[in-house]
């Protein structure tokens, strides 16, 4: 398989690393020349002509522009996007007429709170769910090619309707981002002495608050319609807790909800690289290695 990835950020570079590891030819393209060079150096690849697949790994607001620029450069290629919301993508793609036959909207349910190619991992999608929301026009051969790409990255294909996808990710992805950010914002008013007591509880619940604000502002605004009812329900639950302080009920319901999630073994184990190190047989050699 030959793949071109447009967008040399975390997801785009991780896709490139993964397909390269799976034996595909891959090229990364980015408007930022420095980012493009860094990503291509990491992946160690060259130019790709006549790709089977073009992955648009840019913010959703850029998808229309990228299609306009590249659909005729790669006239036979299947295109996919990897954005967190699908309604706008569907509307944008269908303005291009017959092109929509070779476009498949997708969304890998994977990521990290770090930005850019520097945080990319070849196994980022291993064992994760990768949602596909086919258009009515999406050609069967395009869908087959997309499934092959996803499976080569170790992910599981899940087919959904566009509207259903946007409703579900509002709950399992977008609402947690807002709640984590609100909690983390409380920490900004505290002094370092107080914050030195922070343990795994606050670190775990605020981890995603470290994500790129510009990227998430766009995602949340694009899915505002699905997100607002969830925020209102959350506000209602908080008001009830404040009025009644029924913490036992809240804790029990929270525990039950947590237990309804797939188990900790839902993700496959990662393949790590090992570097043999030879040390002299004398004191403090291991400590010196990490100094």
Regions picked out by a protein language model, each given a short descriptive name:
Residues 1-47:
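NAD(P)+-binding Rossmann beta1-loop-alpha1 motif at the extreme N-terminus of oxidoreductases
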Residues 31, 58, 82-84:
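Short beta->alpha hinge that forms the Motif I/post-I loop of the SAM-binding pocket
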Residues 54-55, 80:
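N-terminal Rossmann-like NAD(P) cofactor-binding module of classical short-chain dehydrogenase/reductase
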Residues 66-117:
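Rossmann-like NAD(P)(H) cofactor-binding subdomain of soluble oxidoreductases
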Residues 124-208:
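Internal alpha-helical scaffold of NAD(P)-dependent oxidoreductase catalytic cores
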Residues 191-255:
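Interdomain hinge/lid region at the active-site interface
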Residues 260-291:
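A conserved regulatory-domain signal marking ACT and ACT-like small-molecule sensing domains
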